[in-house]
Amino acid sequence: MKLGLFDHMQKHDNPVRSYVDLYKSHLEVLEFADQAGMDFYFVAEHHFDMGFSECPSPGAFLGAASQRTKNIRLGPLVYVLPLWNPIRVAEEVALLDNLTEGRLECGFGAGIGPFSFAAYNIPWEQKREMTLEALRIIKGIWTHESFTFEGRYFKCKDIDSSIPLVQKPHPPLWMPTRSKNSIEEAASSGISTIQWVPAGMKAARRAFDEYREVYQRTKPSGSKPHIGLMREIFVAESDRQARIDGEFHWKNFWERRGGARTYGAHGSTGLSTILDGSRRQELMDMEHSIAEGSFICGSPETVVGQIKKIANEAGADTFLGEFTFGALTQKQSLNSLRLFAEQVMPELRNFAIDALNFPRAEA
């Protein structure tokens, strides 16, 4: 099983903690993960999402991370493509692929926050079409000596990237998939897919089953993609200690970040667009969230069982854990990650699931 970190880069509403300290602390966690032998580190892109996610430019952070790590594969998850000029993305990814010496993974998506689209004066309703156009341009620039494209939203003429990619034809790609269109695009192109907590395990399994069906039907060329789950995770020496320490931070996470917030004309935050009130209440119940596989929390032995369970339920071959959520201190996050690396990772390394050929769930 492939194992990695996901990072929203939360500031925890701590007015004393500076942004300098925030970014330093996340680089420290990443360095530890690299030394521990984890496979992936992914960072989110969010804008004006105060406290919840403080990395508006994943490429800038990954450039710094590339010089502090040696083996772990690094990537954005995701570049919100409607907010970017695709030519700029193609160039930036090429630069990062060189800075990482071929350790770059690259996630693309349409975004989940209307407020950031309003701030950038980008029509929210057109995000899917814009994403697909941008993706065509980015891949076209990477794979052609000279590329021309004229679409409804983006156009380019005789563009070539002056920076050659280290990985050919391009770095491995990832895409969160919720809609039928995104599932079709990802699976038919051999792009890895990922699901987070809000959808729930049943929805994740349905999306993965549809992805597998399209992948088997279209049989895209290239290396095999991954099917992954991302979860907040807290590991402690015992189940009791994990629940005592983890409950406050889990509830803090959903109380402060799971509801609708508005920024004047910029509209509501992303989570409020995919979470209704009843689902939010379910997630705020820590025991319910642990039982349904939305929150990974416990001793190392318990966590091994929890991850195996959700991987088997969804047919996933990759697990990404967010170790820095809620108001966890740096010491708590690093201790949780240390226990994971020392006692959980060895048990999961030989746990294998053939995710692309996993049997479809019974109706």
What are these regions, as identified by a protein language model?
Residues 3, 45, 65, 96, ...:
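Conserved, mostly hydrophobic/aromatic
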Residues 82-191, 201-209, 213-219, 359-363:
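Internal, glycine-rich beta/alpha segment that forms the wall or movable "lid"
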Residues 7, 125-161, 202-316, 345, ...:
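An alpha-helical appendage that flanks or caps ligand/catalytic pockets
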Residues 34-35, 62-70, 93, 97-104, ...:
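Acidic (Asp/Glu)-rich catalytic clusters
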Residues 3-7, 41-43, 74-76, 104-108, ...:
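Hydrophobic faces of well-ordered beta-strands that scaffold small-molecule active sites
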Residues 1-68, 72-73, 168-171, 358-363:
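N-terminal beta1-alpha1-beta2 module of alpha/beta enzyme domains
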Residues 40-61, 80, 112, 198-199, ...:
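Glycine-rich, proline-tolerant flexible connector loops at the mouths of alpha/beta enzymes
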Residues 11-23, 79-87, 167-177, 291-300:
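Active-site mouth loops of central-metabolism enzymes
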